[in-house]
């Protein structure tokens, strides 16, 4: 039954009235964030940073090791980090084409290396990146070198002795990696595979010293994991316009926001919403160790057209309590963790506003606890994905509540898939 049908039959069917209350409560309760959209409390998930439903945004700092060669001979091994950010879908259909979009990255060379520059009078460098390869497990192709045939070239990079040297790509705009073709099922992991840079170190005296940096991952190299399932024949997934406002992560860490599509049952009728989770997340876990999310928070997203339909039903405000947002752990313990604290997260009574999508920080201030997650004996990886969610909702200030139950997304939506090292 549709919302309109429920309305037409409400006089003779108490369940229809209950349905209307539930739907209004779910979307209306979300409007509590309207006052927070312009100035969200510290540490809450900023609504303006939440991507569209179905979008995964993130920034990753991966440890790498670069073999530095001069005239074809290895000179030294340089451990450093590659800092990469981008956008991808949270789910894929069988055989669906997809891209990693809005990509950018940088490699930072340490200050001790630039401290050697004055010895040779080195003041500038030119860089030519000939290989930047991103892999996609079980996909076709399995990897793409985005610099193949069109190397990235950076001229006249200033070298300041004793200061870190950051080489970023591209100089302007962003890059897209793809298309890849998804497998028939399972999951796809996008990963940093390889990078090669040819660098000319230039001196004030007019001579140059050509070196080559061949860089490979030295720990985990996964960027993100995407679940595959559902109906075949889906349109290519090449996403644009997602917000990317992340701070620089720590080494071996990601900072990201995943906005997963959910179907919630309220009063017997399904309602599509988005549930977003953002956090700082380690990218590897040691055998015998554990990992946790830090600065974790969530958000409920209600589309504007749903808000408008509920206003048309005669509702202007709602309230409630979120009681569950479960994380499911594969390859580790606990098997399930509810990140909503005991007593729930309150949603104060608030108005609905026509033509306005609602993004509700959960909680409206502070953060959630997620973890620790411990690898199971013999596990090669530990993945954390979004599970079911639930709330108790009320409408119009009434004392009664209506339960809202939201099943886990299908295909699976992963927050992280960490190798056990």
Q: Model-derived features: where do they sit?
A:
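Secretory targeting and sorting signals
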Residues: 1-44
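Primarily mature extracellular domains of secreted and cell-surface proteins
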Residues: 45-421
């Amino acid at each position: 039954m549709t919302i309109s049908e429920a309305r037409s039959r409400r006089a003779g069917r108490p369940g229809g009235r209950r349905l209307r209350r539930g739907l209004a409560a779910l979307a209306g309760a979300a409007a509590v964030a309207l006052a927070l959209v312009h100035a969200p409390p510290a540490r809450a998930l900023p609504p303006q940073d939440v991507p569209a439903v179905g979008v995964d945004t993130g920034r990753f700092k991966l440890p790498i090791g670069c073999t530095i060669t001069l005239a074809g001979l290895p000179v030294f091994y340089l451990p450093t980090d590659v800092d990469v950010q981008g956008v991808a879908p949270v789910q894929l259909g069988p055989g669906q084409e997809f891209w990693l979009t809005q990509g950018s990255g940088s490699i930072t060379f340490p200050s001790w290396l630039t401290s050697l520059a004055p010895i040779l009078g080195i003041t500038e460098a030119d860089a030519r990146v000939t290989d930047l390869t991103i892999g996609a497990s079980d996909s076709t192709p399995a990897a793409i070198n985005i610099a193949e045939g069109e190397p990235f070239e950076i001229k006249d990079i200033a070298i300041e002795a004793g200061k870190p040297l950051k080489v970023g790509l591209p100089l302007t705009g962003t890059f897209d990696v793809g298309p890849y073709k998804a497998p028939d099922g399972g999951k796809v992991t996008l990963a940093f595979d390889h990078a090669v840079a040819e660098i000319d170190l230039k001196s004030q005296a007019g001579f140059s010293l050509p070196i080559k940096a061949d860089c490979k991952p030295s720990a985990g190299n996964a960027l993100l994991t995407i679940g595959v399932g559902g109906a075949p024949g889906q349109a290519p997934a090449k996403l644009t316009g997602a917000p990317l406002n992340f701070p620089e992560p720590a080494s071996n860490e990601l900072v990201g926001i995943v906005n997963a599509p959910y179907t919630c049952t309220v009063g017997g009728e399904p309602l599509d919403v988005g549930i977003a989770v953002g956090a700082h997340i380690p990218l590897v876990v040691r055998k015998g160790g554990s990992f946790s999310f830090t600065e974790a928070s969530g958000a409920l997203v209600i589309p504007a057209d749903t808000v408008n339909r509920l206003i048309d039903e005669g509702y202007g405000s709602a309230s409630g309590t979120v009681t569950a947002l479960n994380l499911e752990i594969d390859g580790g313990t606990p098997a399930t963790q509810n990140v909503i604290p005991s007593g729930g997260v309150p949603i104060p009574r608030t108005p609905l506003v026509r033509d306005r999508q609602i993004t509700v920080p959960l909680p409206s201030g502070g953060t959630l606890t997620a973890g620790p997650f411990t690898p199971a004996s013999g596990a090669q990886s530990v993945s954390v994905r979004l599970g079911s969610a639930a709330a108790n909702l009320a409408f119009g200030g009434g004392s009664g509540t209506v339960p809202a139950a939201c099943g886990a997304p299908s295909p699976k939506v992963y927050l992280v898939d960490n190798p056990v090292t």
